[in-house]
Amino acid sequence: MGMVVSLQTVVSMVHDDPGFYNPATYLITGPLILIWLLIALRSRFSKERMWLALAVISALSLLPVYHRIYDAKLLLLSIPACAMLWAEGGLIAWLALAINLLALLFTSDLPWVFFSIMLSHLRPTLPWLSGPILNAIVALPAPTMLLLMSIFYLWIYVRRSSNAAEPARMIDKIASAR
């Protein structure tokens, strides 16, 4: 369990049954992948959207299926999107930097050695946390950070795609027609 970065490791701490954690993982990641795919297919090409799309899928592709920690080197593909957001400045730039740094830290080889040693001494339930979901987030930060990174970059990607404003315009037209 210690060297696997897929979301199944987190969900299995809630209920350790493949009949539960596999479908639960697909229900979490499936809609995110579908949104990414729809935006990628419907948006006009631009370098900005290309880097954002790559940042999303580099993290998101690790979550639904079995991956080891060394597969997380794919996260290096998110650095250009982070640099692009950093150059723009503001709160989004700081969020991108923090999320990228934490995701890269939690999936790096040396910090993971520390986490695996810590995990071997960790009790199944932490007394200061309530519930298996919080235990999983603390015990397995890599998949949790990958999910956070995926959602963050997907949010930016959707907001900046040319078709993202279309549903909002349609809702405005419907509301003004009444």
What are these regions (language model features)?
Residues M1-L52, S58-I69, S130-I133, I137, ...:
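Primarily membrane-embedded glycan-assembly and transfer machineries that use lipid-linked glycans
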Residues T29, S78, I92-A93:
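Residue-level signal for alpha-helical context at structural boundaries
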Residues W86-R178:
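Aromatic-enriched
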Residues W36-A40, L63, C82-W86, Y153-Y157:
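Hydrophobic membrane-targeting alpha-helices
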Residues R68-L85:
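Hydrophobic/aromatic-rich transmembrane helices and adjacent perimembrane loops
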Residues L27-I35, V56-L60, L75, I99-L105, ...:
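Lipid-exposed faces of alpha-helical membrane segments in multi-pass integral membrane proteins
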Residues V14, I33, S43, L77, ...:
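Residue-level detector of solvent-exposed, low-hydrophobicity positions
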